[in-house]
Curated annotation (Swiss-Prot):
GO molecular function terms attached to this record: imidazoleglycerol-phosphate synthase activity; lyase activity
Protein name from the UniProt record: Imidazole glycerol phosphate synthase subunit HisF
Cellular component per GO, a single term: cytoplasm
Enzyme class per UniProt: lyase
Quaternary structure annotation from Swiss-Prot or TrEMBL: Heterodimer of HisH and HisF.
Keyword list, A-Z: Amino-acid biosynthesis, Cytoplasm, Histidine biosynthesis, Lyase
Principal localisation: cytoplasm
Amino acid sequence: MLTKRIIPCLDVTAGRVVKGVNFVGLRDAGDPVEIAKRYDTQGADELTFLDITATSDGRDLILHIIEDVASQVFIPLTVGGGVRTVADVRRLLNAGADKVSMNSSAVANPDLVSDAAAYYGSQCIVVAIDAKQTEAGNWEVFTHGGRTATGMDVVEWAKEVAKRGAGEILLTSINRDGSKDGFDLALTAAVSDAVSLPVIASGGVGNLQHLVDGITKGHADAVLAASICHYSEYTVGQAKEYMAAQGIPVRI
């Protein structure tokens, strides 16, 4: 088994890190630079920054925040929110991002995935998929911070972006977001088993066993965490020690 990653996720709006439940009810979690430095010290493998209202509010990229973080933190940074063009990808990479995440814009224009991967390589293109379970038991793709239904099937969309050259999929269960009930393991496994590229599980971590389950039962290659880390319930180091004790290879 390859080394598995723990990736703290920093949802950003108005220059602050926030956390909500089911993508709403946001509460302040702190300054993005200070939180990023803390996670770097704790041994996080990567960090993900998502400007969760950039697309819906029509705002520009969070370049200044990424420049500040990249000057003080020395682990890979994935950045998303408001990415609309290949030029936006370049601007974020120049600001210090190692990977760029696209979500709503990829649904609106799937060629953006293909074009960005062709220009910059699949290794730095992440497609974020926000999934909500339907009454029929399937999962539908939602965009614009979970507010807009697309009618698209999550597994089929994952296959499409994989064919178009995405390097990773960041898969979030809207139903589980902030719930602390654990990942939607059926969703995570369905997507992970359908594509050959790495899948990052997101949405619902409430304890350290949930991280283990995301890997062993959800077949994810990495696990994203926000609530349990932002409010100091657990450190990244504690999470890695727990996962290692369960036989999961992690970078200590």
